[in-house]
Amino acid sequence: MSLVCYESSSSGEDDDETISDNPRMLKVPKLQESFHELYKKKPKTFDSPEFHEGRIRGQKHIEGLWFVQTYLEVDLSKKVKKGIREFLNSQSRFQSLLCSEHNVPRRLHLSISENYRINYSTKNQLVHKWEQYTNNLNYRTLKFRLGKMCLLFNDEKTRMFLAFECKFSDENYKDLISHASDCMKEFTNRNLREDFLLHISFASSLTNEDEYQNWVSQDRESHFFKTMNEIINTKIQKDQFSESFIVDSLKLSIGHLIFTFPFCK
């Protein structure tokens, strides 16, 4: 017994009928050009402060161009870190770079080149150049010590840094910097700036163009100049910062990728 009553398919009288009475489907009108422009794929940027610890990027991050940083990673001793913290506690303008915004300890960087951008498709070429170079070095380590304190500004004049100048104990570092400069020249057609300074930044603060001008002009009537001058000339216990540091590898950061090249002999 069937649950549903229906006529047998073999007994239908309308088998030869064709369905031709359906109304013709109307075409959807084309969208206006402004709509296509609205959703047109554009270069992605990652300039929101949430990507940069609350800071606004001075230079836009454009899709396909990857940020390059070449540096020596420095693990400061407990004594030096303690000295830095004590020094920073004596003022309120600068924030320590020894920890992230989430209070995660991090190592500091001694940059051996300016930061620059390369096309993503050329990143393997840059990595290969550093592999070849570090595999043919005639030394295993570089030794340096901290020099005097200085105040530095980024190119956009939006941030300033407290830093220690770095003094190397031999001449090997010069060839390393020369190679880094050659890489930047090859991939960006830019030369290393003449005032490039080997340094380790340990604290930062927001700033602006007016403060930068007050500093470079050494405007002694400026409250900002007098305050910053007092900070970098603060008498600190030199024995806390007199240690020598040894590094045995180079770091190359390309976008979110980090490559380590040990110094081989």
UniProtKB/Swiss-Prot annotation:
Record: residues binding UMP: L197, L198, H199, I200, S201
EC numbers for this chain: 4.6.1.-
Reported consequences of knocking out the gene: Deletion of mpn1 decreases cell population growth at low temperature and leads to a generalized pre-mRNA splicing defect, decrease of mature U6 snRNA levels, abnormal U6 snRNA 3'-end processing, decrease levels of U4/U6 di-snRNPs.
Active site annotation, chain numbering: H109, H199
Transmembrane stretches, start-end: none
Catalyzed reactions per annotation: a 3'-end uridylyl-uridine-RNA = a 3'-end 2',3'-cyclophospho-uridine-RNA + uridine
Predominant subcellular localization, coarse grouping: nucleus
Subcellular localization, as worded in the UniProt entry: Nucleus
Superkingdom to which the source organism belongs: Eukaryota
GO BP terms in the entry: U6 snRNA 3'-end processing
Keywords, comma-separated and alphabetical: Hydrolase, Lyase, Nuclease, Nucleus
Gene Ontology CC: one annotated term: nucleus
MF (Gene Ontology): 3'-5'-RNA exonuclease activity; lyase activity; poly(U)-specific exoribonuclease activity, producing 3' uridine cyclic phosphate ends
Keyword Nuclease: yes
Role noted for this protein: 3'-5' RNA exonuclease that trims the 3' end of oligo(U) tracts of the pre-U6 small nuclear RNA (snRNA) molecule, leading to the formation of a U6 snRNA 3' end-terminated with a 2',3'-cyclic phosphate.d. Participates in the U6 snRNA 3' end processing that prevents U6 snRNA degradation.
Alphabetical list of HAMAP family matching this protein: USB1 (MF_03040)
Family, as annotated: Belongs to the 2H phosphoesterase superfamily. USB1 family.
Protein name: U6 snRNA phosphodiesterase 1
Organism listed in the record: Schizosaccharomyces pombe (strain 972 / ATCC 24843) (Fission yeast)
Gene assigned in the entry: usb1
